[in-house]
Amino acid sequence: MKRKLKVAIIGSGNIGTDLMIKILRHGEHIEMGAMVGIDAASDGLQRAARLGVVTTHEGVEGLSRMPVFADIDIVFDATSASAHTRNDAFLRAIKPGIRFVDLTPAAIGPYCIPVVNGERHLDAPNVNMVTCGGQATIPMVAAVSRVARVRYAEIVASISSRSAGPGTRANIDEFTETTSRAIEVVGGAAVGKAIIVLNPAEPPLIMRDTVYTLSEFVDERQIEESVTRMAEAVQTYVPGYRLKQRVQFDRIDADGPIRIPGISDRMVGLKTSIYLEIEGAAHYLPAYAGNLDIMTSAAKVTAEGVANRLLANKK
């Protein structure tokens, strides 16, 4: 029987619950050890208990007192940016070697986008999964930047209001700041900007994302091929990730430059527009919540890589 490492999830909201179900159903190198929350009546904790997962409603303090904590190697944090800073410090003081996969915008550790730089950070004590919008769009920015120098990249992430729980809503400012920075650090853009839209439409609409880049002039076919390959790579762990239409191009020359406030009044180059749609696997919330699915899928595949590395080192 294949050995698996035990994990704990902090945060029993939409993201934590969806992640728990993914691990229970599809964990390869990891298995559930504990589900941690602060509300005993939350659906996530109650569902975890029904599924046979050990739970606590006393936060990380409760987790540290649980017998299973001694066997926990990896902790997922699906709370908030401010809470994650405290959670990491508290648990690391007790267990210095513990690994964190951070699903908040706290960004204590390096940004991790599995298809772009996931292999690079398997030994990091704490990795940050950026944001749902970042997981969806940064691969596309990286796809452009690997064939052309990107001077500016802007992403717009539109998610169903119903899929945004209290944690997501509390992190809106951190969402834009963390995603913008990761567009630059991981995506390779000189300057990045992120916008999030909570769409109140009923019935809820599927997650849609738009990526704009302004790069040096190159053969458009190179960018289109790079984008297609990157989308296929993301689909290996998020099957519902897809290009909504063909990549669009606009050549902006010196006769008609564009102004980007705070960047330049006369920018020229190749404008690339990429339109994405992310359909969720409906493990917890319905398929419209692609924002949950891409975040939890990216976190799971990252933790699987970390666990595989740890298991190999223990042999």
From Swiss-Prot:
Q: Which SUPFAM superfamilies match?
A: Glyceraldehyde-3-phosphate dehydrogenase-like, C-terminal domain, NAD(P)-binding Rossmann-fold domains
EC number, as in UniProt: 1.2.1.10
Q: Which domain of life is it from?
A: Bacteria
- Which InterPro entries has this protein been placed in? Acetaldehyde_dehydrogenase, Acetylaldehyde_DH_C, NAD(P)-bd_dom_sf, Semialdehyde_DH_NAD-bd
* Keywords on record: Aromatic hydrocarbons catabolism, NAD, Oxidoreductase
Pfam families, per database record: AcetDehyd-dimer, Semialdhyde_dh
Which residues are catalytic? 132 (acyl-thioester intermediate)
User: Which enzyme type, at the first EC level?
Assistant: oxidoreductase
Has keyword Electron transport?
Answer: no
Gene Ontology molecular function, alphabetical: acetaldehyde dehydrogenase (acetylating) activity; NAD binding
* Single Gene Ontology BP annotation: catabolic process
Reaction catalyzed = acetaldehyde + NAD(+) + CoA = acetyl-CoA + NADH + H(+)
Binding sites annotated in the UniProt record for NAD(+): 12-15, 163-171, 291
Question: Can you tell me which family this protein belongs to?
Answer: Belongs to the acetaldehyde dehydrogenase family.
Q: Which HAMAP family match?
A: Ac_ald_DH_ac (MF_01657)
What is the official name of this protein in its record?
Acetaldehyde dehydrogenase 1
What organism is listed for this UniProt entry? Answer: Paraburkholderia phymatum (strain DSM 17167 / CIP 108236 / LMG 21445 / STM815) (Burkholderia phymatum)
